[in-house]
Amino acid sequence: MKETLQAMIRAAATAAFEKGALTASRFPDIELEAPRFRDHGDFATNLAMVSASTQKMAPRKIAEAIVAHLADSAGILLKTEIAGPGFINFFICPEAWLPVLHRIHEDQERFGACDLGGGKRVQVEFVSANPTGPLHVGHGRGAAVGDSVARILAFCGWQVHREYYVNDAGNQILTLGRSVLLRWRELSGQAVDFPEDCYQGDYIRSIARQIDAEHRQALEKMESAEAVAFCARVAADQILDGIRRDLADFSITFDQWFSEKSLVETGAVETTLARLKETGVVYESEGALWFATSRFGDEKDRVVVRNNGEATYFASDIAYHKNKFDRGFNRVIDVWGADHHGYIPRVKAAIGAVGRSQDDLDVILVQLVALLREGQPVSMSTRSGEFVTLKEVTNEVGADAARFIFLSRHYDSPLDFDLELAKKKSNDNPVYYVQYVHARIASMLKKAAEEKGIGRVTAVDDKTLRRLAEPEEIDLVKLLARYPEAVSHAARFLEPHRITFYLLDLAAGFHGYYSRHKVLTEDDGLTMARLYLVCAVKQVIKNGLALLGVSAPESM
């Protein structure tokens, strides 16, 4: 509808110029917005006002010229009005909205899809938590955001590659090994002074007990450095296996788990730094190697190899991001915790230094989650230093509720997550509110089959469709027509919460309609038209939930 109206306005402006009613032939992009108030129409444009300087005319005169030359060959306009200094308000004929129902029934699960990506390849790297402990709630929000962004981009024509970067080569892995070894020594009866910089959680003791049961004799024969490395390897593998299971339970899978250690072992880090040194962006100073990130917009240069010969985490990140583009991705999206915001300029600098546009990298920063129970804060960590895990939250409220709530606000805003609210079977629970629409319509269709012998409603003629004339019905159809734009905007701006917001609006529209009107009536024609409408609602609810990674239950 919006595209049709934009074309009509563009044609009207051109016609007005050709007939001398306007002075310039070029016009800015035509923006159409849905007015806040119903009496301002279905769409409004400020084209006349933003064209005033070019046309050298009063905005209201421009608006009058455009309206006078509107050709409504499709018969979609009920009326137009010029408001205020030059806004043009468009009122769409109610029946002009109805064809969207046919599109939904024809496209089904593809309704709302587009070709925004044009088949280009995009890599979405998300979660990428260190294999030094279980995933916590913050990781869960990042996981939901990253996976939903990937789903939306794939739906909009991108070839999407999901990747988890395993940080298995840094000092944190040695610290993990030392932590486990010290806990193992405690199990063996040794007095141990456990350092504060070691990992404190009870999961470390659990791993130590397992190693003691399976590898005690071998460990007793090892020198300290070998024992640390052994414990680190066993612990990291076990933790990573747990992360994989937790993410699978959260309906998240990856195309690739990329090892940081592989970059070191294959010489990719060393080779990348050598090439950058040849180009002059990596230089030696004070016995260390520095990357001249300040040349690319960072506030200062960064160390990539310390004066003791040890590569920094940033060195691996440079090699990793170069590797991403070497694999042929047109675009790379990283999903990080908000505490990494200061890291963006240096990674952008690395992208520029390896010959890519910094715009080829998008970084999504995900803010923190505060857990609540009936409105009261829940302690996010125990005395032992363990954060509330994603697994614990998923086990308590379910993956669907967790994912929906994680996506219920823009990721750049902190999120309050009420565990009790997420379990309620009431309209106060947003995921229940949306899923119940799907389940209620499924129940309605079952009743239609049992009581009226009406099977799946797949086709309704236009005459029958025009029986949908109640204001709430037309409003519901208008909401359905908004879905493709919600999807394309979510893809364009990498904002999955737009889908969540849309689904809540659609659910509210359906609940309001259902409370006022019976779908299964004594009038067979009206019943068929209304079933056709609610089937479309059911399909769009299912489509939107799928983009969030949330199920659409047939019963609740």
Swiss-Prot record:
Q: SUPFAM superfamilies per the record?
A: Anticodon-binding domain of a subclass of class I aminoacyl-tRNA synthetases, Arginyl-tRNA synthetase (ArgRS), N-terminal 'additional' domain, Nucleotidylyl transferase
Motif position, 'HIGH' region:
129-139
Subcellular localization(s) per the UniProt record: Cytoplasm
UniProt GO BP = arginyl-tRNA aminoacylation
InterPro entries annotated for this entry?
A: aa-tRNA-synth_I_CS (IPR001412), Arg-tRNA-ligase (IPR001278), Arg-tRNA-synth_N (IPR005148), Arg-tRNA-synth_N_sf (IPR036695), ArgRS_core (IPR035684), DALR_anticod-bd (IPR008909), Rossmann-like_a/b/a_fold (IPR014729), tRNAsynth_Ia_anticodon-bd (IPR009080)
Q: Does the keyword ATP-binding apply?
A: yes
GO molecular function terms listed in the Swiss-Prot or TrEMBL record: arginine-tRNA ligase activity; ATP binding
Return the SMART domains for the record.
Arg_tRNA_synt_N, DALR_1
Q: Which reaction is catalysed here? A: tRNA(Arg) + L-arginine + ATP = L-arginyl-tRNA(Arg) + AMP + diphosphate
- Please name the top-level EC class of this enzyme: ligase
Q: What is its EC number?
A: 6.1.1.19
> Pfam families annotated for this entry?
Arg_tRNA_synt_N, DALR_1, tRNA-synt_1d
Q: How does it assemble?
A: Monomer.
For this protein, the record's PANTHER family field holds:
ARGININE--TRNA LIGASE, CYTOPLASMIC, ARGINYL-TRNA SYNTHETASE
Q: What is this protein called?
A: Arginine--tRNA ligase
